[in-house]
UniProtKB/Swiss-Prot annotation:
Single Gene Ontology BP annotation: glycolytic process
Main location per the UniProt record: cytoplasm
Sites where the protein binds substrate: N10, W11, K12, G174, S214, G235, G236
HAMAP family for the chain: TIM_B
Gene: tpiA
Name listed for the protein in its UniProt record: Triosephosphate isomerase
Listed EC numbers: 5.3.1.1
NCBIfam families membership: tim
GO cellular component, one term: cytosol
InterPro entries documented for this protein: Aldolase_TIM (IPR013785), TIM_sf (IPR035990), TrioseP_Isoase_bac/euk (IPR022896), Triosephosphate_isomerase (IPR000652), Triosephosphate_isomerase_AS (IPR020861)
């Protein structure tokens, strides 16, 4: 089953609106056809209006880095999935380890967010990943499998087939340490196997699984050669236009 790759840059808390606009203008005309790959950037909430506007006539898709699970209400500081859809966002990244760690988000929160994102016609990119301690204890597949099952609970098979799962080992995020090709393949396959167990093999064959964690132009080709890796969620290398575009060289 051929799945279209998806390369998504996660800017995290970087770039002001002017910098976001300049980045989009630098990459937009150089992106490959959407027949070959989906390309997205996850912009901070303060940059979304500018980024969506700058990207609107290009193939570049735009993700929010988080949202709440309610559309409106007395939730000071939160981002409405309904408004994200009205603004023209395509994806929402949820469950990133930084959100889980610093802001104490639970699997239940992430599951509620996934449902709210789908209810508003957007696509979630759901992150999962283990700590170094869990990895070294040989419990990575078990731990990540539980995260994935909990995040997808109550979604329809059709919804799961259309979403993106991003496996990011916490010990490889922004550390310069990256998982080996075998680690990435084995864990992305483990993620897919959980989907197969919960929703059937047909759904598992359709869902796209990204690898994330110190992905760079120099190693992206190795990861993309893995049969169960359908893309990358990229932090640092997505901040500069040149390095972001170089991530797409795996197509050549």
């Amino acid at each position: 089953m051929s799945r279209k790759p998806i390369i998504a840059g996660n800017w995290k808390m970087n770039k002001n609106p002017q910098e976001a606009k300049a980045f989009v203008e630098a990459v937009a005309s150089k992106l490959p056809s959407t027949d070959l790959v989906d390309v997205a950037v996850a912009a901070p909430a303060v940059d979304l209006v500018t980024t969506i506007e700058a990207a609107k006539d290009s193939v570049l898709k735009v993700a929010a880095q988080n949202c709440y699970f309610e559309n409106t209400g007395a939730f000071t500081g939160e981002t409405s999935p309904k408004v994200l859809a009205e603004m023209g966002a395509d994806y929402v990244v949820i469950g990133h380890s930084e959100r889980r760690d610093y802001f104490h988000e639970t699997d239940e929160d992430i599951n509620k967010k996934a449902k709210a994102i789908f209810a508003n016609g957007l696509t979630p990119i759901i992150c999962c990943g283990e700590s170094l301690e869990t990895y070294e204890a040989g419990k990575a597949a078990e731990f990540v499998g539980a995260q994935v099952s909990a995040a997808l609970a109550g979604l329809s098979a059709e919804q799961v087939a259309s979403l993106v799962l991003a496996y990011e080992p916490i010990w490889a995020i922004g550390t310069g340490k990256s998982a080996t090709q075998d680690d990435a393949q084995n864990m992305c396959k483990a993620v897919r196997d959980v989907v197969a167990a919960d929703f059937g093999q047909e759904v598992a064959d359709k869902v796209r699984v990204q690898y994330g964690g110190s992905v760079k132009p120099e190693n992206v080709k190795d990861y993309m050669a893995c049969p169960d890796v359908d893309g990358a969620l990229v932090g640092g290398a997505s901040l500069e236009a040149d390095s972001f575009l170089a991530l797409l060289d795996f197509l050549n």
